[in-house]
Each structure stands twice: as C-alpha cells, then as structure tokens.
C-alpha cells in the first residue's frame, strides 16, 4: 500500500506553501501582539470605568477624595442613567429585553468582580447596531444593568476584515507571481533536458533569472553543445566507416562476378556475406538516424501497417492481420513508424517458425500496433534488456544479426512519446505492442482479421 504524500513535490508549490505559512504565522502573531498589548489593556480600562459607574449607580452614597460622604439624589441618578443610556431590568424583564441572546464571558465577569469587590456576572449581546453589556452584581443581585455601547458599531470591523483579506490576497498573488517568474528558467531547463533525453538537441537556452539559475543554464548549454558535437562526430565517423567498408565490399562483389561457373556456390556464399555486411551497416546508420528530430504529421496507422505488411509478405512468411476497421489517425513520422514495424516483423520472422500476426487498435485515447510470432519466446527476466543495443535475447534465439533492430524500434517509439510492451503471443512466442499516446481520431468499427 502506497503511503499518501501531503507535502508538495514541485519547488513552486513548496515555496508558495512556505510563503503562505509564514504569512499566516505573521498574521496570528500580529493578532496575539495586538490582543495582549492593545485590546486587553483597553478592555481592562473599560471594565474599570464601567465598574466605577455601576458602583456609583448602585449605592446611595459616594465617598469623595477627602473622605466626605455624598448622598446621590434619585433625580441626579436618573439623569445619569438617561445620559449614559443605562437601564435597569428585573430577571424576567431582562430576558424579554434581549438577555436571552446575550453570551456569558467568564474573563469579563472575573475582571468586573475584582473591580466591584464581589461576585459579578457579565453577558454581551451582539445585535445589528451596537453591542450591549448586561451586568448583575452582588450589590443588587435581582437587578440586571443594561449598558449599550453606542460608540461601537458592527460595521466598524468590516473595513478591518476587508483590508486584512485584501492584504492576504495581494501577498499570496505577489508570491505566486514572484515564484512563477523565478521558476520559469527551471521549466525551460526541464523541457530542454527532456529533449536531450530523446536525442534531440535544443537551441541554446536564454540565460536569465537568479545568478544560480543562470549558472546552471550556462552549464546546460555547454553540455548540450558537447552532446551535439559528440553525436555529430559519431554520425560522421559511422558515415565514413560505412563508406570505407562499402568500397571494398563492392570490389569483392565485382570479383565474384568474374568467378567461373565451377565456383558459383562460393560466389553465392560470398554475396550473401556481402549482403549481410551491408545490412549491418544500414542498421548502424538507421540507429544513429533515429536519434534525430523528426517532423510529425497526421497519418493513418492502418495504412502504414498495410504498406509494411505488403512489402514484407512472401519469402515463406505467413503474416496474419487483425487491424481495427476504419482509419486510425495518429500524429507520427510515417517513415520512422514503417521502419519500426518492419524491424518488428523481421525480428518475428528471424526468431519465429513462419507465423506472424500484425494487429492494431485504439484504447483510452491511445493507438497501438502489435507484432506476434510463434518462436520460443523470451524469459520474463530477460525481457527488460531486449531493447538495449546489441542484445538478442537468450541462447534459444541466438542467430545472426547486430542486435540493433529492436533498439531502433525503442528509439522511434520514444521519439513519438510512446511506450513498448513485451508479452507472450497466442502461440507461445514473443508479442511486442507499441503504444502511441497521441491524440487519436477514433472511428467506430470492429477489428478486421485476415
């Protein structure tokens, strides 16, 4: 069972996640600092002032600074009530006036109890206009004091929320844009590296971005230039070797033409060896040629397979077909696909016992073609090495050849962004299926067998 990954894989996502996390931590830290050093001290001061007001309203006498006791007339107390908007309610009346919707705050009750010197309950009612504070003190346990905070409005906090949200969105958007700009050279490097992996040397990349990225880009350009020079030298070397080898082979062929009839069997054997040498040279050149960039075009896969089948039929070969009815339009390089199919058919003819089957189809927006034989097959542990250059399977399939035929097929399919699958044919031999994961114009129909 695969373990689930919760961390992002790409550097873009990781950097963006880091910036968002730091921004969130910064906002939380700012909130805690403002809460502890601004809001809570202000709230304590508010509670202290409110406690003084309640104490003055709940007692008949006030003690002045010089110790004098001052009696508060009822009319003066009512005037203070009116100016401050304070009203008194019994328990039942308070419930009807909104106490039932108020929420109890323990820390406010604790602070108010310290200021008033006895048990105090504080509740806060939040309505559409302004919050309301409800108090019940030990000075008058059956009376609720309603204090509206008229200077505080619910709309006062909306701009703060909008500004905070706007700052967060701007910070995240800026971080996303910054990281995208920083990662753009890396994306170019990735695409270029994939092309080099397919044997296609891209033009030199533009050196931009951070100094470290420019250094990597510069090193990559040097490496790509070196790989291109090496490939050009290899191609030139093989072209020269093939030319130099074909010259004496041609002279040998001319010499066999001058041999007498009594040496006809010897001349025929020499000509077969010459043809085999020419075939080996052609395979080397084909292997080098498949690494070059190929122009793609839309073509019918069944038509390409049909041309190869027509060309390879005969020569004591029985080629059966099971092609999907209709046209399978695939973006490909037709000549290269023909070469791949021909190599697969030749491989099946060389190692099989005369029976060959070529089939095609579409599945999950991918096209495929398959070549099967009735030979001894390949052991499963050896199949992964079959497409490597100069590998010809196990000893049961050891015959003449360079071992480049299927390696050429692998490079051609790789250049088409495809993949190869090896299996067992319906007659116990080898089955090779090539997938072309490109847009396919699929038609309705059945498979045609011949």
Swiss-Prot record:
Cited SMART domains: HAMP, HATPase_c, HisKA
GO molecular function: ATP binding; phosphorelay sensor kinase activity
Chain positions found as Phosphohistidine: 243
Subcellular location per the Swiss-Prot or TrEMBL entry: Cell inner membrane
Membrane topology term: Multi-pass membrane protein
Chain sites annotated for binding ATP: 243, 347-351, 373, 392-393, 402-406
Principal location listed in the UniProt entry: membrane
Protein name according to UniProt: Sensor histidine kinase EnvZ
Domain of life the protein comes from: Bacteria
Sequence ranges assigned to domain HAMP in this UniProt record: 180-232
Post-translational events: Autophosphorylated.
CDD domains attached to this UniProt entry: HAMP (cd06225), HATPase_EnvZ-like (cd16950), HisKA (cd00082)
Catalysed reactions listed for this entry: ATP + protein L-histidine = ADP + protein N-phospho-L-histidine
Stored Pfam families: HAMP, HATPase_c, HisKA
Domain-related comment: Has several major domains; the N-terminal cytoplasmic domain is followed by 2 transmembrane helices that anchor the protein in the membrane; the periplasmic domain between the helices interacts with MrzA. The cytoplasmic C-terminal domain has a HAMP domain joined by a flexible linker to a histidine kinase domain. The HAMP domain by itself is intrinsically disordered. The cytoplasmic dimerization domain (CDD) forms an osmosensitive core and includes the autophosphorylated histidine residue.
Domain named Histidine kinase: residues: 240-440
Role, per record: Member of the two-component regulatory system EnvZ/OmpR involved in osmoregulation (particularly of genes ompF and ompC) as well as other genes. EnvZ functions as a membrane-associated protein kinase that phosphorylates OmpR in response to environmental signals; at low osmolarity OmpR activates ompF transcription, while at high osmolarity it represses ompF and activates ompC transcription.
Enzyme class: transferase
NCBIfam families, per database record: PRK09467.1
EC number: 2.7.13.3
Residues exposed to the Cytoplasmic side: 1-15, 180-450
């Amino acid at each position: 069972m695969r373990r689930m990954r919760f961390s992002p894989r790409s550097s873009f996502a990781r950097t963006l996640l880091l910036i968002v996390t730091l921004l969130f931590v910064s906002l939380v830290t700012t909130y805690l600092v403002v809460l502890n050093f601004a809001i809570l001290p202000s709230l304590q001061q508010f509670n202290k002032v409110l406690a003084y007001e309640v104490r003055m309203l709940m007692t008949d006498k006030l003690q002045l600074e010089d110790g004098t006791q001052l009696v508060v007339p009822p009319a003066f107390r009512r005037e203070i009530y009116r100016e401050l908007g304070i009203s008194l309610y019994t328990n039942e009346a308070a419930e009807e006036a909104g106490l039932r919707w108020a929420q109890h705050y323990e820390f406010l009750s604790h602070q108010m109890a310290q200021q008033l010197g006895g048990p105090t309950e504080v509740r806060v009612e939040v309505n559409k206009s302004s919050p309301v504070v409800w108090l019940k003190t030990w000075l008058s346990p059956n009376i609720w004091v309603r204090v509206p905070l008229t200077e505080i409005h619910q709309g006062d906090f909306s701009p703060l929320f909008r500004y905070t949200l706007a700052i967060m969105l701007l910070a995240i958007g800026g971080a996303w844009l910054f990281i995208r700009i920083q990662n753009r050279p890396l994306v170019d490097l990735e695409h270029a590296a994939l092309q080099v992996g397919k044997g296609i040397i891209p033009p030199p990349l533009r050196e931009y971005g951070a100094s470290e990225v420019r250094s990597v880009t510069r090193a990559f350009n040097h490496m790509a230039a070196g790989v291109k020079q090496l490939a050009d030298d290899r191609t030139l070397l093989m072209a020269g070797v093939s030319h130099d080898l074909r010259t004496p082979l041609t002279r040998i062929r001319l010499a066999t033409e001058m041999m007498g009839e009594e040496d006809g069997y010897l001349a025929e054997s020499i000509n077969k060896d010459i043809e085999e040498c020419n075939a080996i040279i052609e395979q080397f050149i084909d292997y080098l040629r498949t690494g070059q960039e190929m122009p793609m075009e839309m073509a019918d896969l069944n038509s390409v397979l049909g041309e190869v089948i027509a060309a390879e039929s005969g020569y004591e070969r029985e080629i059966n077909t099971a092609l999907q009815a209709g046209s399978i339009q695939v973006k490909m390089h037709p000549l290269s696909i023909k070469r791949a199919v021909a190599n697969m058919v030749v491989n099946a003819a060389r190692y099989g016992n005369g029976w060959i089957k070529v089939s095609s189809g579409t599945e999950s927006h991918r096209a495929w073609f398959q070549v099967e034989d009735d030979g001894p097959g390949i052991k499963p542990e050896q199949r992964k090495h079959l497409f490597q250059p100069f590998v010809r399977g196990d000893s049961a399939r050891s015959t003449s050849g360079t071992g480049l035929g299927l390696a050429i097929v692998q490079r051609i399919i790789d250049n088409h962004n495809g993949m190869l699958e090896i299996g067992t044919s319906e007659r116990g031999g080898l089955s090779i299926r090539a997938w072309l994961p490109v847009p396919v114009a699929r038609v309705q129909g059945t498979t045609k067998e011949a």
